[in-house]
Amino acid sequence: MENLKIIVINLKRRTDRREIMEKKFQDENITQYEFFEAFDGETLRPEDPILGVFKHGVHGLSRKGVAGCALSHYTVWQKIAADTSGTKYLVLEDDINFKPNFKENLSKVMKTIEPSQAMILIGMTVNGDDVTKTRDIYELDTSYTIHPLGRDYYAGGLFGYILDYRAAQYFVDYISYNGIRIVIDYLTYRSGFPMYESHPHLVYTQSVQHDGEHVDSDIQHQYDRIKYAIIPNTYEFDDYVFIPNKDSAGGDIREVCADIPILKNIADKDINCVAFNTYGWVKNNIKPLHQLIDIGNRYYESDGIYIKKNYLLKEKIIINSLNL
């Protein structure tokens, strides 16, 4: 399997899983692979800067295991995005199982990949009611070919996939603008990036495909939650005026799940943007200053709105207290 690197996401404390994966590779006569140290949700603390990517996230992302899983894939993508050589990567979670003749069948799949196919699932969770009806394509098919992702059947899962730097960079950029608001497998699914799947599937996991028995999963059975800290706002910019605990209703271009430096970078690049607030909204218009509304401190010790100075000067909005 030339031009393919294998990465296994593994928690440092789960040496048992590492050993099991090593045995699976040995059984398949696979000698070239590396383990990538996963983010351990147990060790995440409210003040960790990396948690900024979850701002505005759905409730489930406060679970430590889910957050750790998302961060693990995100950091793997950052690593892969830096490799522009054209090498493809197979990313595996450490609780997967290989289907029979995995190495041989993976080689068959690799030979059918088209240059445009940059993100390919070789296993996924299928909606329960669809398991039987999809058996012919996901279990019994022997074509070992690539097809557009069956979105009608997809119920999640990033436990085994092939990608290259193009897909990795897309997801990294997507997160830099939007943050991680939903669980990581659905983020890729909803991001708009073209996704594909192998027929048949080559890997599966018991963590979601089981008949009710207990399974060893650091995500499914980890319910402790992260309490996100309100962090200081020490950001001052020469080309923006910050008005604490105020916002302008309406005039929104889009919501961006990001911290202040990234929000500013986005605002700087958008000629239509005149302001952004620390809740994550980039704006193309603001109300007169006397009509600004009050907002509380949700993410920072001092939330508020940053307004471009050149906009204030252009509109001849001059307030002595803002030192314009």
From Swiss-Prot:
It is an enzyme of class 2 (transferase). InterPro entries: Collagen_mod_GT25, Glyco_trans_25. The keyword Acetylation does not apply. The keyword Glycosyltransferase applies. Its EC number is 2.-.-.-. Disulfide bonds: none annotated. One of its GO terms (molecular function) is glycosyltransferase activity. Keywords: Glycosyltransferase, Transferase. It comes from the Viruses. Belongs to the glycosyltransferase 25 family. This is Putative glycosyltransferase R655.
